[in-house]
Structure formats: structure tokens, C-alpha cells
């Protein structure tokens, strides 16, 4: 073994701070005095003018500065009252803050839907076929195409040792760990051992790597660039008494730079012959040299394909969606609907405002996050979360948005989701708007799904494949699933994500207006669709992930030999 790495002469960056892929904590309320959506201008009330007058007196007359604390408290009380806040003390230092009457702060979408439904039902102008065919405007002159081979170097002849990682989380968190591990193994000129999957307490899926991904194809696809083995050789295992846990587990910083790996990990690898990182999640910086980025591209977009049982059923499901959507040229819409109980609970948003819902959500938060939401000083702001676009969209809101964009009741819609919170109640309006709606449970037979039951990652792989091949993909909330899927769609569809990411701040404002006109709502939704089309092709920024933005690291811009023409 030798100490050569594959960093080359490329410079490396230090640690990069980027937003966490998991859902953020509740945001602070943003007090603004700008124009509202309806164009109204905020005016100062009598209470606020009194507060400012008192403060001006204090700062002009130094003799009354001792009264400042009392005046401050009195002013804050007036301020809170004038802005319409209600504070509910839950005890143990936890408070829920409501801001009464703020546009968009309350879930009023069912009232809007009930009033608009007769108009929506009667609106047959245009056809869903045309919307599906014309949702994405033709690209002209040039397109983005995969060009991974130009950025990837060959594997070294002599390995520096064995690199072992443990991947945790759900399907796409594991995918992230695998692809980054390939890049690190290439950087260190190490042999990668097929990653070990950790049994996650949330996902509860005991699947191994080979149950989800095609092991043999993974090894073959990487063979020219990174050495991969299914398990450690017998002589190495003997040194550690056949116990992988005895191998040194390195604790690495999040978002570590290539230089960090060469300075801290490579010497240990050369000395010991094998190193382990458990867990290995978000342990490599986004900005690395081009040939290391190329390994990420190769692993994610080419080497990782699902295991044959998943692949075969997923292909059948896609074929069935295409057959059912024959009237629209085999095109369909897929929606990643994040309205499971854990997502609703974590968001700290409210929907029916009943005591039963509150108790249910409190219990769900305690089960999943053990006191995180009961810490002293924690302030929960459901209204502010909704105004700020942090609340998961309900099935009803997704349906209204799509109908407003022009997708009518003949549109075939596939919903990718886990167990929807109160599914009978919340899914009914979406089915009413889109009666041809499909899920994996309606698209596949119980016998076909039986081997996948109890394995959330394998079920997610079925959803991933059906969404990947849809004409339009709708992402309703953040997370690793849409992040990877959007990047994969860009890789397949000439750089365009062909994805709708709703402007939820705008949407909650519109759905807070019971008197809103259907034609006005439609115009706003169609503007939103055009905006998503315009943002479909985006290059990766320094602090962004190539798994979502594969250009320019994994794709090259080329002239389009067959430019698409506008049917008009």
C-alpha cells in the first residue's frame, strides 16, 4: 500500500455551512409594515403612538430614565395588544403564540374550497391534455446533457486500505451517504466496502444494501474508478476477531473538506489498513475538486440502481400509469405529499384547532423527539409558521393549486406518501377534484406489494421511480426525497427539473380569502406554474448540492440537434 491520494492539484475549501436537510424549527414572527397582498397599507394605532411618545419623553429628559423599565413593560403590553397577539402558556416554560387576524395565519382553505367548488366543477375551459403537453416551454438552441466521464479519474492500482461506512436514515439519506462514501474512497484511493445500513428508530427498516440497491451493478459501474468489495477479506477480519465494531471508528466533522480527509483520515488508513465511520452522514463538503465531484455524479446517477424486485414492480407501475393516461399522451402528474402525522407534528402547525388535534400532536412530538418541544423557553407559533410557508400543504390545498393551474378532473395524478394523517378526512377533497388519483396501493396488487410491506425504504423506492418518470412532479415540502428526485429529473430531462415547487407564502394568503374569485385564483396559480418553468434549469451554487443541481458538475451544455419547436 502507498500513500498516494487522488486529490491532484485541485484546491480544497474549508467547512461550508448550509441549511440542514431536515425540517427547520419554528421561525420567528416577522413584523412587517409593507403592503398586504390585497394592497392595504398598515396604519399606526393610538396605542402605538402613545408608546412612541413616552419613549421620546424618556430620551429627551434624562431625569426620568429611571422610569424606563416600567415604561418599556407598559409599552410592550400596549404593543402586543395593538398587534393582536394571544399567548397560551402550556407550562414548563413553553408558550404558544398566536397573532390574531394576520392574513394567512389560519387554515381556512376548506371554507374557500366549499365556496369555489361549484365554479371549479363547472370550469371546463381548456383541457388537461394541453396543460400537460405545454407545462414546460421548449428549450432553444442548447440543452444540458450528462458528461460524467470527462470529470472522473481512474482507480489507483494499489489501494491504501479499506473504507467502511454506516449509512443511517431513510432511503435518500442512505443514498447521500453512499455517494459521498464513493467520493471519499476515491479521494483516499481506498477500497470501499459495501455500506452497512443502520436500523433507524424512525424508519424501522431492516433492509440491507442488497435489498434496496443492485450490489453487483454498483460494483461493476464503479470498477474503473473506485474499488468496491462486498465484504472485508478474511485476513483483515481475522485481525479484528471477525468483529467490524473492533475497527477504529473515526469521528469526523460535518461537511469536512478534502484536505481534512488527507490530513486526518489518510494517515490512519495507511497505519491501520481499515477505518470505519459510523454514522457517515453529511461528512463531505459540497465544494470539492471536479474529479471528486465526478465520482459523486457517477455513484448517484449511474451506479445506484434499485434491486431487481423493486425495479421490476416499479416499471410495471409506471407502465400502468402511462396506460391509464392514454388520453393525455401517456403523461401524468406525481405529487410527493408530506402530510404524515410526524411531519404535521414537527411543523407545529394547526389545522382543525380542536383540543383532540392538539393532544394528538403533543403525543406525536413526544414520541418522536423526546422533550424537544417542551424545553423551557420554547415558543410555538402556529400562525407564524403558516404565514412563513413552513406548514405542510394539505391534500385539499395541493388539489386546488393544480386545478387552478389548469389540470382538470381527467388528469391522472399519482400520490407518493406514507400514511397520511387522518386520510379519510384530508384525502377526500383531493379525490373529489381528481377522481383518477392513484397511489402504490391502488396501482399495484396486494400480492405484488406483500414483499415490500414493513420496509419503508423499499416502498419509498417504488414511489421514487413512479415520480421520476412523470411529466410533472409536485414537491410540497422539503426533504431528501424531493432534493434527490429533482436532481435526477434534471439529469434525465436535459437539465430541466419539470417540477412544481409551490410558493406556499403566497398560497396561504390566497386561501385565507373566503371571497376570492376563481378566475383571480387561477391567474395566480398559472403565474406560479410559469415561474416554476422559468426556474427549472438552475446551475449549482457553491453552497448547494449537486444531487439537486447536477449542472455543471455532472452535465455539459451542448447544441440541441433536434430543437423543440413551439406548437403554436
Curated annotation (Swiss-Prot):
Residue spans crossing the bilayer: 65-85
GO molecular function: glycosyltransferase activity
GO annotation (BP), single: fucose metabolic process
EC primary class: transferase
Matches recorded under InterPro entries: FucosylTrfase_pln, GDP-Fuc_O-FucTrfase
UniProt biased composition (Low complexity): 1-19
Keyword Glycoprotein: yes
Glycosylated residues (UniProt): 125, 151, 189, 243, 408-409
Protein's pathway: Glycan metabolism
Pfam families assigned: O-FucT
Bilayer topology: Single-pass type II membrane protein
GO cellular component entries: membrane
Enzyme Commission number(s): 2.4.1.-
Region (Disordered): 1-33
Family membership noted in the UniProt record: Belongs to the glycosyltransferase GT106 family.
Entry protein name: O-fucosyltransferase 9
Native source species: Arabidopsis thaliana
Lineage, top ranks: Eukaryota, Viridiplantae, Streptophyta, Embryophyta, Tracheophyta
Gene: OFUT9
